[in-house]
UniProtKB/Swiss-Prot annotation:
Family listed: Belongs to the periviscerokinin family.
Keyword Secreted: yes
Function summary: Mediates visceral muscle contractile activity (myotropic activity).
Protein name as it appears in the record: Periviscerokinin-2
Length: 11
């Protein structure tokens, strides 16, 4: 996912 302010899982 993304390692930013908001971690978003890869879907």
């Amino acid at each position: 996912g993304s390692s930013g302010l908001i971690p978003m899982p890869r879907v």
